Amino acid sequence: MKMNMDQWTKELLEAPVKKALPVLSFPSIQLMGITVKELINDSDLQAKGMKAVADRTPNSGGAVSLMDLSVEAECFGAPIRVADDEVPTVVGPVLDTEIDEDERMEVAEALEVPEIGAGRTQIYIDAIEKAMDLITDRPVFAGVIGPFSLAGRLMDVTSSLIYCYDEPDMAHVVLEKSTEFIIKYIKAYKAIGANGVVIAEPLAGLLSPSLAVEFSGDYCKRIAEEVKDENFAVIYHNCGNTANVTLDSILSANANAYHFGNAVDMEEIMSKVPSDVICMGNIDPAGQFRNGTPESVREATLSVMEKCCKYPNFVISSGCDIPPMSSWDNIDAFFNAVDEFYAK
């Protein structure tokens, strides 16, 4: 359903009671009795899964698609590993780490930007188009990887951090191609009517403040400028532990909202951002949703809300993607705790 997302952002900021907006999609496999492997290869199952999650969580502020950070890298030729009960992962780079610097630059320059429809991208685009027909009571967000997180997977995650210092020109070549692809991919989601996109840039959380601007922030800003408008929102996600010291880089993206992980103190983040900038977070997805209990989830949720809801721009959420096999008792406990807090 078409929505004015500038108005949505304004109303969310002004609402005294804010709906939680966790990154919740993969646990749909439990509601449907399927595997992750089946989910990531079938647009109908993805759309039905998003609808099942929406029906189970009437008080959620949005429907978020799969945070599958293997999709884009796979299009560039990166090998991935798929399991029945875990999120897919990239298991090897596209650029050989064993060749010399000049050769690596040649490989980077020869890297082709995939067409939209390569790999599983069309499945994911079709899934959002189908979900838009099924979910009409809240915004529907697509999910894509961020520029440095994609480039890092193509270059090898550990090596990419070294390349920022030792081979910055090569890193920028890969970043340019990653950014070009991400923009095309988001525009494909926009064309089929998605209300917005969550851009997941976790790898930027490993960069120092000076590098974060050059190798992530500037590219995220360019992506947002290309795709964001009054009918299409951008939510920027960074679950790194340096988000508190790279806030200038993060906020330069000019997104509608920013989503933070549990590696940072959410109250510290809130104290540092302008009061008109929506920030979301940050209940531990693994420690609480996956491995906690309903009581521990309740306590963690109330604790974060008690510290952060005094800031009018705070929205309670998970710290990152909620793992596929997280207990629905824990997920229900999270939403119940949000209701409990606002009922006080």
Q: Language-model features: where?
A:
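A gly/proline- and charged-residue-enriched helix-loop-helix capping module
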Residues: 86-130
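Short amphipathic alpha-helical segment that frequently serves as the phosphate-/nucleotide-binding helix
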Residues: 44-47, 125
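Glycine-rich loop at the start of a catalytic domain that most often binds anionic cofactors/ligands
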Residues: 70-86
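Catalytic domains of carbohydrate-active enzymes, especially glycoside hydrolases
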Residues: 46-68, 188-195, 252-255
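Surface-exposed strand-loop-strand hairpins of Gram-negative outer-membrane beta-barrel proteins
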Residues: 34-45
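Active-site loop segments of alpha/beta catalytic cores
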Residues: 1-28, 36-37, 114-344
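Short, glycine/charge-rich beta-strand/loop segments that flank catalytic centers
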Residues: 65-75, 141-150
